[in-house]
Amino acid sequence: MSIKHPIIVVTGSSGAGTTSVKRTFEQIFYREKVKAAFVEGDSFHRYDRYEMRELMAAEAAKGNKHFSHFSPETNRLDDLAQLFKDYGATGSGRFRHYVHDAGEAKLYNTEPGRFTDWEDLEQGTDILFYEGLHGAVVTDELNLAQHADLKIGVVPVINLEWIQKIHRDKATRGYTTEDVTDTIMRRMPDYVRYICPQFTETDINFQRVPTVDTSNPFVARWIPTPDESMVVIRFRDPHGIDFPYLLSMIHNSFMSRANSIVIPGNKQDLAMQLLLTPLIMKLMDRKRRAG
């Protein structure tokens, strides 16, 4: 954690919706004139798309059916921890990009599925923003959660998460439902060991809960819409949270526990704006006072 160079992480599984949350942060940063450095968790994978395919096939041939990107072994978490440590101390650090598609390939002049070269973060940023799988992971060797000043978990109920992943991967990556199902099953042990425990470390969790039947996510024809959902917002430490204000500002919201508020799904962006803006500005105020 750092007063002069704060770090925000948004962590969630593949298909959880962390990219949408990132867009909300971008809106807040733009409105409040906060200059952020953005880092994606994909860029800290240990292997590129083609290396990973070969390794998965080799591991499967050995009988390992659970070789996945969710594991610390397939990610450069030591480099991510070093980035967090360096940024907290100096406001800089080394990062790279992972090139997802043809559009990014043109932007970074790198083949899709590959990494760009390592480079230094731009000087003079106010905040480091990380979005990915491992922002709050804690293992016997590493504690990434300790470096972040604000940790956000994006955690749809698991059937909804799977529906979102299946539809996204089919639409953008050309996968079949069977392909995505195999991926989900392969990742499950690492999901339980390394993804779920992070949501105990996060300061705020946003959990979307559908109000329609998602009993069999592998045959769902549509992703439940925000109007067909509620969102449970859970605070690790509810002290200082103005719940009466939130209840008055978000129509049809209610408290389900002393540290949790439930809102209509179509109010999630508004809730994030109301909740996160003061927290970000508090970090910026601390930064300014520290000189």
Swiss-Prot record:
<dbReference type="InterPro" id="IPR006082">
    <property type="entry name" value="PRK"/>
</dbReference>
<protein>
    <recommendedName>
        <fullName>Phosphoribulokinase</fullName>
        <ecNumber>2.7.1.19</ecNumber>
    </recommendedName>
</protein>
<keyword id="KW-0547">Nucleotide-binding</keyword>
<keyword id="KW-0113">Calvin cycle</keyword>
<keyword id="KW-0808">Transferase</keyword>
<dbReference type="InterPro" id="IPR006083">
    <property type="entry name" value="PRK/URK"/>
</dbReference>
<comment type="pathway">
    <text>Carbohydrate biosynthesis; Calvin cycle.</text>
</comment>
<comment type="similarity">
    <text>Belongs to the phosphoribulokinase family.</text>
</comment>
<dbReference type="GO" id="GO:0008974">
    <property type="term" value="F:phosphoribulokinase activity"/>
</dbReference>
<dbReference type="GO" id="GO:0005524">
    <property type="term" value="F:ATP binding"/>
</dbReference>
<keyword id="KW-0418">Kinase</keyword>
<comment type="subunit">
    <text>Homooctamer.</text>
</comment>
<keyword id="KW-0067">ATP-binding</keyword>
<dbReference type="InterPro" id="IPR027417">
    <property type="entry name" value="P-loop_NTPase"/>
</dbReference>
<dbReference type="GO" id="GO:0019253">
    <property type="term" value="P:reductive pentose-phosphate cycle"/>
</dbReference>
<dbReference type="Pfam" id="PF00485">
    <property type="entry name" value="PRK"/>
</dbReference>
<feature type="binding site">
    <location>
        <begin position="12"/>
        <end position="20"/>
    </location>
    <ligand>
        <name>ATP</name>
    </ligand>
</feature>
